[in-house]
Amino acid sequence: MRFSTPIEISPLPFQLTPQSHIVVLGSCFAEHIGQRLERALPPDRVSVNPFGVLYHPTVLARALARIAFAHPLPEDIFFEGRDGLWHSWWHAGAFSAPTREECQRLVEASLNQAHEVLQKADLLILTLSTDHGYYLKEELSCGSLVANCHKMPSKMFEEKVTSLEQSIGVWESLLPFIKAHYPQLRILWTVSPYRYAKHGMHESQLSKARLQLMIDHLIHSKTANDNPFLQISGSKVSTQSLERRKKMSEIFGETSEIFENILESMLKRSNDFTQYSERDQESTENYSKKEKEERKDAATSSFTSSVDTWQFYFPAYEMLLDELRDYRFFASDMLHPSEQAVDYIWEKFRETVFSSDLNDCASHPYSIRQALAHRPLHPESDDYRKFYTKTQQRIAEFTQKYGFAPQ
């Protein structure tokens, strides 16, 4: 007899190891999973919500673009709130500070740390929560969509639902750049199990459905998985990348200069690729079609992803609503998952993506921390000295095996 509907999780073609680097972006649920990853790996190998908790797909895309290409943040995202603190329209309240300088220092330090981790990352976890966005009625150069309202007056904002087509357009414009610049990276999408009662349960379900449709489209979309650079077709160069950069500029409320800079920095990775830019089109017209294809393949090889399939979906949302279909798995507000539910989903996540080495690595620090936390009744006794020596030996063996000390 069965009393639940187990969710089948498709096997993934990769596993995380003790040497892995991971970036986690998104909702409160992303924060919960990220904190557990931080206990399994050294802090410098995991970056969890470097912009704070984010919910909206476009806000996540904007944050990822900044992290991926380390472009300076706009000046007008910073403002002084009603509480006397300085905030950022692009960040959660965790970065608020008494002065503008301190707020800016905090967000820049977090951005730089996330960029460093992403350079080596095996996995990027993206957790979406809602497509309801809040827009400033007064347009700023940094765009009007905010990550957090920071308890400012509601009359300053307009709530809008982002259409499925708009959300897809945002990510189809960005993902090819991410894939080209980070060929080793894989993306694991999830949808937050949190339900938005303030929108009504029906609209909450519709919002989650749109996010799931967006993710499914992106995983299978040719546009989201192609090469973002100019392509050769006969003797002509298409303007696909120019159109994409224009689209990204519209999305993020900036001029195309940022994306020109991104493209230039990526082009530097290949000395030969510049011959396929528009300004060099004439110089390639004398080549035969075969020669052009050979030269193009050589030039773009460094932008080819080292993984065949790079986007995947993890069914955290389905686990809570179907497999754990009981109010005992919800927090007291009946909307958030309980700690027990998060632990259950985390264990399923571990079973899916952790290698045996990482599972072994993640289990040791807990027992070592317990040993270090032990307060002996007789610290001068032979038994405690043996216990202490054995604990230090375990720490040394762990460090030698995995290359870092247990946290």
Listing of model-derived features with the role each one plays in the protein:
Residues 32, 43-126, 130-135, 156:
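Conserved SGNH/GDSL esterase-like catalytic core that processes O-acyl groups on lipids
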